[in-house]
Amino acid sequence: MTTISRYTVFGNPVAHSKSPQIHQQFALQEGVDIEYGRICADIGGFAQAVSIFFETGGCGANVTVPFKQEAFALADEYSERASAAGAVNTLILLENGKLRGDNTDGIGLSNDITQVKNIAIECKTILLLGAGGAVRGVIPVLKEHRPARIVIANRTHAKAEELARLFGIEAVPMADLNGGFDIIINGTSGSLSGQLPAVSPEIFRNCRLAYDMVYGDAAQAFLNFAQSNGAAEVSDGLGMLVGQAAASYSLWRGFTPDIRPVIEYMKAL
């Protein structure tokens, strides 16, 4: 009897997550059966929930808001990009029973921009809005693409300054932003409640791409704001979601899915 490999995504809330549908599409490409669920861990109960999942046969897990930094603390070892980010979105069970933490958010974002949308990051000026775990996780990979400049802005400027020092990028107060950006990436949590970041509409003049890390309806307020104020192209984070999921799947199973048909499949749902 063949044992079906079990995976899950931890978050709170997590009922909205599209990860199960995405990973089932990857499994169809590989020609295997997997089980992929959702676990809403209690705040303060993440470590216990992870322990129970792996002790009862779990093979790998994704981690979303608000547990990515807790997952980093929980892992026994890390990839270089997870260490740089200080946040983990992928837990891999090793043969020795230890957990390896990785962060595939940056790969998902950069692949969506450069491969799916065919927009180069190299030599571009990038603005990151927000300074939470989502933004922190993508900075190391964005830097690998050698942009001309990365600027970070956050509602609480001190948090932006902290990340700027950590990663060797620039921090600018939101109120002082005035344009000159090729790519603007919104990683604030405000999109989840329909709130726009407190930035001037002028920042979108001559912007090649405005990108929101969230996907679906939650991204529309920011994308409409960007497009109506001059952004040449706008995108939600569906491609990033599928891309980071594909990288996680590859780490667990050694099979690299084709993300393009899965992005189209998810758009059609």
Swiss-Prot record:
The active site is at K68 (proton acceptor). CDD domains: NAD_bind_Shikimate_DH. It catalyses: shikimate + NADP(+) = 3-dehydroshikimate + NADPH + H(+). NADP(+) binds at E80, G130, A131, G132, G133, A134, N154, R155, T156, H157, A158, K159, M213, G237. Keywords: Amino-acid biosynthesis, Aromatic amino acid biosynthesis, NADP, Oxidoreductase. Its EC number is 1.1.1.25. Pathway: Metabolic intermediate biosynthesis; chorismate biosynthesis; chorismate from D-erythrose 4-phosphate and phosphoenolpyruvate: step 4/7. GO terms for biological process: amino acid biosynthetic process; aromatic amino acid family biosynthetic process; chorismate biosynthetic process; shikimate metabolic process. The keyword Amino-acid biosynthesis applies. Pfam families: SDH_C, Shikimate_DH, Shikimate_dh_N. Shikimate binds at S17, K18, S19, T64, N89, D105, Y215. One of its GO terms (molecular function) is shikimate 3-dehydrogenase (NADP+) activity. The keyword Cell inner membrane does not apply. InterPro entries: Aminoacid_DH-like_N_sf, NAD(P)-bd_dom_sf, SDH_C, Shikimate_DH, Shikimate_DH-bd_N, Shikimate_DH_fam, Shikm_DH/Glu-tRNA_Rdtase. GO terms for cellular component: cytosol. Homodimer. NCBIfam families: aroE, PRK00258.1-2. Belongs to the shikimate dehydrogenase family. Involved in the biosynthesis of the chorismate, which leads to the biosynthesis of aromatic amino acids. Catalyzes the reversible NADPH linked reduction of 3-dehydroshikimate (DHSA) to yield shikimate (SA). This is Shikimate dehydrogenase (NADP(+)).
